[in-house]
Amino acid sequence: MNKKILSLALMMGAFVSMSAQSTARKFVLQNSADGNSLLTCYLPQNPTGRAVVDCPGGGYAHLALDHEGHQWAEYFNKQGIAFFVLKYRMPQGDHNIPLSDAYQAMRTVRDSAAVWHINKEDVGIMGFSAGGHLASSVSTHAEYDARPNFSILFYPVISMNPDLGHAGSSYNFLGNEGVKDQKLVDEWSNDKAVRPHLTPRAILLMSNDDEVVPPVTNGVAYYSAMRNAGNECTMHVYPTAGHGWGFRDADHGFPYHEQMLDDLTAWLRSLPKPNPSAIRVACIGNSITDGFGIPMADVKGYPAQLQQKLGDGYEVKNYGVSARTMMNKGDIPYMKELAWRNAQAFLPNIVIIKLGTNDAKTHNWAQGAEEYRQSMQAMIDTLKALPSKPKIYLCSPIPAFKDSWTISDSVIVNAEMPIIQKLAKKNKCAYIDLHTSYIYKDMMLSDGIHPNAKGAEKMAGIIFDAIRKK
């Protein structure tokens, strides 16, 4: 924990007596320069390394800090989960105000992970109603260091369209003029911001009869976006109880309280426990890495199947983005993507690069072989400069069994592969010849470009063998 956080904790009487049976320490930190955003920290007696940052609701006008905040501390601490209640500032039309508070809270927890016995790769965010919108905004828009590893969303506001979400939240978050800006409304309607692999897994909990925040255009819309993106997501819809029940039990209006806790507990127990000492593997690529056409690509895409083969001693991340090129002058360059920034921030120990299929399109290859070579060299140079000093594997594209989208297998074989081989030798990178090794024409989608789930498993096996050879 840095000196600034420590001094703030001491100034504010940080070491507070135990507030509940499972809480070892409770203290409050200043979370904004003006002192109006606060982070109340509940550290458990028996930490597991997991943590949750909580964003109470209140329509971006006030905060329900009790039943959507502090009352949850014992529930989480009893499971060994550190719990942090965020008192965020109201936007009053400036959405950057609560967002900056939420980003700061996430960074504080990760910056202090060693002192607070937290695994910085196991930090989730939780939000209720408008706080659910804030939590889902962090999940979909934050950079790597502030993005949670999982999300817990209770009856969340997802749409910023006043007619589809919660009008008060929309006007308070975006302002009277902002709500008239369709581009801004779409940007912060978070079902439209879900990204494959980058948006963390989530659980959504809501009531079917919620008339304040309609489930279908909010929580259900987020679930649908997650499912369509191939991301892991769970949803529980309770028959009645409306909106805003939080931690209230049956005696206080929520008859499904115990069932809800059981559902949430089971989901939390199902989450993987990241190994802090795992070898970190970043899979960089296009739609073939992304898992285009493979339902639930986060489970059946080649990076996910590579994870299964490598086991718990490795942590494999999918940084594939569909349609992207290696060429910086291609139609959609990979190195302009958030996924590229995230792959670097991940500080990988191993990097698998498989880019070139889209470069082999007629209009892209018109940029020339030298552009392809220079762009790949630039990517290699950037990765070699990372403090983690990753081992880099350069892969040739798999065969283009058809010329869909003008992708030329001849360009791949006669132009790209020699460049990749020369760069591998020059930069002392490993080379994986997927083009020769991948002979599974019957394991392709009908476009002849993308492997199906069985083909992705074969790809994972080829790459696994190369990694194991070291």
Task: Please identify what each model-predicted range represents.
Residues 64-66, 71-73, 84-120, 251-257:
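Catalytic nucleophile-loop/oxyanion-hole region of alpha/beta-hydrolase
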Residues 104-169, 185, 190:
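Primarily recognizes the serine-hydrolase "nucleophile elbow" in alpha/beta-hydrolase
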Residues 203-210:
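Short beta-strand/loop motif that positions the catalytic acidic residue
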Residues 211-218:
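Conserved alpha/beta-hydrolase "acid-adjacent" motif
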Residues 220-275, 446-449, 453-457, 470:
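C-terminal catalytic histidine-bearing segment of alpha/beta-hydrolase fold enzymes
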Residues 242-253, 294, 398-470:
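Catalytic His-Asp segment of secreted/periplasmic serine-dependent ester chemistry enzymes
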Residues 278-282, 288-374, 411:
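Conserved SGNH/GDSL esterase-like catalytic core that processes O-acyl groups on lipids
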Residues 354-360, 381-414, 435:
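Active-site segments of SGNH/GDSL-like serine hydrolases
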